[in-house]
């Protein structure tokens, strides 16, 4: 019998893994927020610093311009056609980032595959310079491997 996957644990592991990847790349501390986004009260009025901490999936260093949304989903997405799942993730990332005046940065861990990074196209000034590997455009978002983005 196939073992049931605990989605909460899988998401927590992905967030920890992503925090380690970003910490290593930037040499600055990144950490899990520790409260699932579903449990974060959107209606509660938080002060600016608390809102900065609890809005994203990761606590980012001071001055980091991105709001990091982390997903761990075992589904591939066809970037040539509309994807309700990807649209849902992008809306959440964009809404959260807008609420704290940051740039949305979606990182998607695929089961037994690498990480995918998704950023708004308007913030990618020169795709030829930034992305040395394969990238794609989905609506107004640039999609590439996280490894390619972080170099």
Residue spans for each PLM region:
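Catalytic phosphate/metal-binding cores of nucleic-acid and nucleotide-processing enzymes, i.e., regions
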Residues: 1-151
